[in-house]
């Protein structure tokens, strides 16, 4: 059957490991979005870096193929609501930051919708299989939510969290009302 191919890394590590300012910034972002380790942040940064690299390449490409690729890039970024402008330009893509991608993670959206009290609890609910997107259980906190899926996030029907009087659920809704 042959050897399975070796998959490449999906992230790039920082060039220098001990820059205090970068470490502090990463720590704040990790706490705000409930990331477990820096690798999750680096994956999102690499994804953003790839979008920006593609935009820089397309700025210099004035052919019709370059125009088609720019439209495709805009469609992907609009599908995930990373780019929210009506008439996007490549400059809008270049001005994106890491928080625009982190806001579209399932973990962040579950917390923002009030299905969990904290980002860490949102992560726990997702990993334990209590959250469904379009009726399908999703156990990946880093799953990027498209605009179409935004309103279809709910508790799994056979989960104990689906009950209105579950202790964790009532605590989350009572804090939301205050």
From Swiss-Prot:
Domain of life, per lineage: Archaea
Biological process according to GO: ribosomal small subunit biogenesis; translation
GO molecular function: rRNA binding; structural constituent of ribosome
Pfam name, any one: S4
Keywords: Ribonucleoprotein, Ribosomal protein, RNA-binding, rRNA-binding
InterPro entries in the cross-refs: Ribosomal_uS4, Ribosomal_uS4_arc, Ribosomal_uS4_CS, Ribosomal_uS4_euk/arc, Ribosomal_uS4_N, S4_RNA-bd, S4_RNA-bd_sf
Gene Ontology CC: small ribosomal subunit
Domain S4 RNA-binding: 104-166
Region (Disordered): 158-178
Biological role: One of the primary rRNA binding proteins, it binds directly to 16S rRNA where it nucleates assembly of the body of the 30S subunit. With S5 and S12 plays an important role in translational accuracy.
Complexes and interactors: Part of the 30S ribosomal subunit. Contacts protein S5. The interaction surface between S4 and S5 is involved in control of translational fidelity.
Similarity comment: Belongs to the universal ribosomal protein uS4 family.
NCBIfam families: PRK04051.1, uS4_arch
Name under which the protein is recorded: Small ribosomal subunit protein uS4
Source organism per UniProt: Methanococcus maripaludis (strain DSM 14266 / JCM 13030 / NBRC 101832 / S2 / LL)
């Amino acid at each position: 059957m042959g050897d399975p191919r070796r998959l490449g890394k999906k992230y790039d590590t920082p060039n220098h490991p001990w820059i205090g300012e970068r470490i502090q910034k990463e720590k704040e972002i990790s706490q705000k979005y409930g990331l477990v380790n820096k690798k999750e942040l680096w994956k999102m940064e690499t994804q953003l870096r790839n979008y920006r690299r593609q935009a820089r390449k397309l700025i210099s490409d004035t052919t019709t193929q370059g125009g088609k690729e720019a439209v495709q890039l805009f469609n992907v970024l609009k599908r995930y609501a990373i780019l929210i402008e009506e008439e996007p330009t490549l400059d809008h893509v270049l001005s994106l930051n890491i928080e625009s991608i982190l806001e579209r993670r399932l973990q962040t959206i579950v917390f923002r919708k009030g299905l969990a009290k904290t980002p860490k609890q949102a992560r726990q609910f997702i990993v334990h299989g209590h959250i469904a997107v379009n009726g399908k259980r999703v156990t990946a906190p880093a799953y990027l939510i498209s605009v179409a899926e935004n309103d279809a996030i709910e508790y799994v029907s056979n989960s104990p969290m689906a009950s209105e009087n579950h202790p964790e659920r009532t605590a989350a809704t009572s804090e939301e009302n205050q």
